[in-house]
C-alpha cells in the first residue's frame, strides 16, 4: 500500500527559498531540490529564483526531457495542500 501523501501548505513551502533548503512546486507536487541545485543542467540560478514558489509554467516553457521528468520524481517530498491550489 502507498504511504499517505504528505501535504505542505504554501506558507510552509515559501520558507524554503534559500540555498540551505530549496523547495519548488511543479504540478501541485513539492520538490526538495537542495541537493540538485549544482547538478541542474539549466544552472542553479533559475532554480533559486523560483525557490519557495510554483515553477510549473517555467518548467513547461523551457521544455524538459523524459529523462529530466523521471529524475525529478526522485526529489518529490509531498504535494501542495488542496486548499492552496488555484480554484
Curated annotation (Swiss-Prot):
Q: What does this protein do?
A: Cytochrome b5 is a membrane-bound hemoprotein functioning as an electron carrier for several membrane-bound oxygenases.
- Provide the species name: Alouatta seniculus (Red howler monkey)
Annotated Gene3D superfamilies? Cytochrome b5-like heme/steroid binding domain
Sorted UniProt keywords: Acetylation, Electron transport, Endoplasmic reticulum, Heme, Iron, Membrane, Metal-binding, Microsome, Transmembrane, Transport
Task: Enumerate the subcellular locations listed in this protein's record, separating them with semicolons.
Answer: Endoplasmic reticulum membrane; Microsome membrane
Ranges for domain Cytochrome b5 heme-binding come to: 5-81
Per the record, residues carrying N6-acetyllysine are 6, 15
The positions annotated for binding heme are: 40, 64
Predominant location: endoplasmic reticulum
* Lipid bilayer topology: Single-pass membrane protein
In Pfam terms, one family for this protein is Cyt-b5
Q: Which GO terms describe its molecular function?
A: heme binding; metal ion binding
Family membership noted in the UniProt record: Belongs to the cytochrome b5 family.
InterPro entries recorded: Cyt_B5-like_heme/steroid-bd, Cyt_B5-like_heme/steroid_sf, Cyt_B5_heme-BS, Cytochrome_b5
Q: State the protein's name.
A: Cytochrome b5
Q: Name one GO cellular component term.
A: endoplasmic reticulum membrane
Amino acid at each position: 500500500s502507498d504511504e499517505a501523501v504528505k501535504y505542505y501548505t504554501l506558507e510552509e513551502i515559501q520558507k524554503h527559498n534559500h540555498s540551505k533548503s530549496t523547495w519548488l512546486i511543479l504540478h501541485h507536487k513539492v520538490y526538495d531540490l537542495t541537493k540538485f541545485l549544482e547538478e541542474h543542467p539549466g544552472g542553479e540560478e533559475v532554480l533559486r529564483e523560483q525557490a519557495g514558489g510554483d515553477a510549473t509554467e517555467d518548467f513547461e516553457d523551457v521544455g524538459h526531457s523524459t529523462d529530466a521528468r523521471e529524475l525529478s520524481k526522485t526529489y518529490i517530498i509531498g504535494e501542495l495542500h488542496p486548499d492552496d491550489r488555484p480554484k
